């Protein structure tokens, strides 16, 4: 069954709603240029009240290693998601399992993926304006090729309307959504979250 991560969590209410809807993981953004950015203290307060067995993921972009490792300990993160140009050596120095994000323009965006030895690979649409959360899709054929490198988490423009098609076509390890289930910036829509998770988990992949 496909795993589902709801990213850009900013409140206890949204966190608990996503968990109750069946989310496997919650994402917290530690990037001050994102509209979904949280201070570590804010995230820690939300994470503290989560039930067990929910994976907590911290998203970072070009952050100093010391900052990442400090936040992982303070917030008790399970996984770190790196969205910048961090090399394998940097990933290896992070004190948690790492998901490395690749922003996909075309097939050449996978050229350096074989240099990484990480827990998973997140594929998102390339944008000149943002590192994720853009609501833009990319050619899913690229994701099929990327599966040979390890567990693939599909992101980029996913919504309740297209997630079943994406899962059926790519059969990824997981899917990741942020803007696609929002009612407004920083606010999740409960019905969209419920539909997204239900459709992602009910669909059987083709591969």
From Swiss-Prot:
Keyword Isomerase annotated: yes
One Pfam family here: PRAI
Keywords: Amino-acid biosynthesis, Aromatic amino acid biosynthesis, Isomerase, Tryptophan biosynthesis
Recorded catalytic activity of this chain's protein: N-(5-phospho-beta-D-ribosyl)anthranilate = 1-(2-carboxyphenylamino)-1-deoxy-D-ribulose 5-phosphate
Source taxon at top rank: Bacteria
One GO biological process term: L-tryptophan biosynthetic process
Biological pathway: Amino-acid biosynthesis; L-tryptophan biosynthesis; L-tryptophan from chorismate: step 3/5
EC number, as in UniProt: 5.3.1.24
Gene Ontology molecular function terms on file: phosphoribosylanthranilate isomerase activity
Family annotation (InterPro entries): Aldolase_TIM, PRAI_dom, RibuloseP-bd_barrel, TrpF_fam
Alphabetical list of NCBIfam families matching this protein: PRK01222.1-4
Protein family per UniProt: Belongs to the TrpF family.
Name listed for the protein in its UniProt record: N-(5'-phosphoribosyl)anthranilate isomerase
The organism of origin for this protein: Geotalea daltonii (strain DSM 22248 / JCM 15807 / FRC-32) (Geobacter daltonii)
């Amino acid at each position: 069954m496909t795993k589902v991560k709801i990213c850009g969590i900013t409140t206890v209410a949204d966190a608990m709603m996503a968990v109750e809807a069946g989310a496997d993981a919650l994402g917290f953004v530690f990037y001050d240029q994102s509209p979904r950015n949280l201070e570590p203290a804010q995230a820690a307060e939300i994470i503290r009240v989560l039930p067990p067995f929910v994976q907590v993921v911290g998203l970072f972009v070009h952050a100093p290693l010391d900052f990442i490792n400090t936040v992982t300990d303070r917030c008790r993160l399970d996984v770190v998601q790196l969205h910048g140009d961090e090399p394998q050596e940097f990933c290896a120095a992070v004190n948690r399992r790492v998901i490395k994000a690749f922003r996909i323009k075309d097939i050449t965006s996978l050229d350096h993926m074989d240099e990484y030895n990480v827990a998973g690979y997140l594929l998102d649409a390339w944008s000149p304006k943002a590192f994720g959360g853009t609501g833009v899709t990319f050619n899913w054929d690229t994701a099929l090729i990327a599966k040979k490198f390890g567990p693939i988490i599909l992101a980029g423009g996913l919504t309740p309307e297209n997630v079943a098609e994406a899962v059926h076509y790519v059969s990824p390890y997981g899917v990741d959504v942020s803007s696609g289930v929002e009612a407004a910036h920083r606010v999740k829509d409960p019905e969209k979250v419920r539909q997204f998770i239900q459709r992602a988990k009910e669909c059987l992949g083709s591969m």
